[in-house]
Amino acid sequence: MPKHSALERAWPAKEIVEDLLELRKRSPLTHIMTNIVVTNWTANVLLAVGASPAMVIAEEEAGEFVKIANGLLINVGTITSNDAKAMKIAATVAHQTNTPWVLDPVAVGALGFRTETTKKLLDLKPTVIRGNASEILTLAGIAGKGKGVDSTVNSKDALPYAQELSGKTGAVVAVSGEVDYVTNGKETIEIYGGDPIMTKVTGVGCSLGALIASFLGIQKDPLRASASASAVFAIAGSRSAKKSNGPGSFAINFIDQLSQLSIE
């Protein structure tokens, strides 16, 4: 793999290579319960990297499908009452069957319904919680200065609260920002890379949660799975940005880079 020195100092390239190769070999079936804004993008991201996404959201099917899935993402971005019921069923079954799952608490704290739903989902023991700094602060019980889905808090500032949240919930916590942090409360991995243009394409952050769910399907260590997924994202983001003239070309190049990411 080509040199990405800051990234490699934080997370060994060997682990990324092993996990990416295993994902491409096994193509984990990933149950995606995400928001309507990013569904198509998320599916394309997972297909590009080598996973098998399935967008099953119906209350009548959610529990049945999660039993055969290798990983589950629950993203509350455009949550409805019916979605909340289906998500609770899926998370309950995932907890009962030891299916690893990711909670993405989009804009938690900004509105009451999604906040209450997220609190209930936390009780069902997500394997990984992925969010921006404001969302992680809110979940840790801190009054963050959130403005919807964008973060006004630095990811480094949120790290102590991510560690606290991990300790409270038992989940690995992944904080997205200029530098990504992945922590299990005791060990923390820093992921460097990516590019600011990634914030100009809707769904990029949400699809990282889905990618983590896919990596959980092939890697039993949730800290390593989250770090490998974040690193793949960062590498693809950095390379795509160098080839892009703006958000439109970046979106296309990002999918291509995920698909073509070389193992050298």
UniProtKB/Swiss-Prot annotation:
One Gene Ontology biological process: thiamine diphosphate biosynthetic process
Q: What is the lineage of its organism?
A: Bacteria, Pseudomonadati, Spirochaetota, Spirochaetia, Leptospirales
User: SUPFAM superfamilies, per this entry?
Assistant: Ribokinase-like
The pathway that the record names for this protein is: Cofactor biosynthesis; thiamine diphosphate biosynthesis; 4-methyl-5-(2-phosphoethyl)-thiazole from 5-(2-hydroxyethyl)-4-methylthiazole: step 1/1
Positions of ATP binding: R130, S176
EC numbers on record = 2.7.1.50
Which amino acids does the record list as binding substrate?
M55, G203
Q: Origin organism of this chain?
A: Leptospira borgpetersenii serovar Hardjo-bovis (strain JB197)
Q: Which UniProt keywords apply?
A: ATP-binding, Kinase, Magnesium, Metal-binding, Nucleotide-binding, Thiamine biosynthesis, Transferase
Enzymatic class:
transferase
Please give the name of this protein: Hydroxyethylthiazole kinase
A Pfam family (short name) is HK
Protein family per UniProt: Belongs to the Thz kinase family.
**Recorded GO MF terms:** ATP binding; hydroxyethylthiazole kinase activity; magnesium ion binding
Which CDD domains does the record match to this protein? THZ_kinase
Q: Does the keyword Transit peptide apply?
A: no
Q: Does the keyword S-adenosyl-L-methionine apply?
A: no
Briefly state the protein's biological role: Catalyzes the phosphorylation of the hydroxyl group of 4-methyl-5-beta-hydroxyethylthiazole (THZ).
Q: Superkingdom, according to UniProt?
A: Bacteria
Q: Which cofactor does it need?
A: Mg(2+)
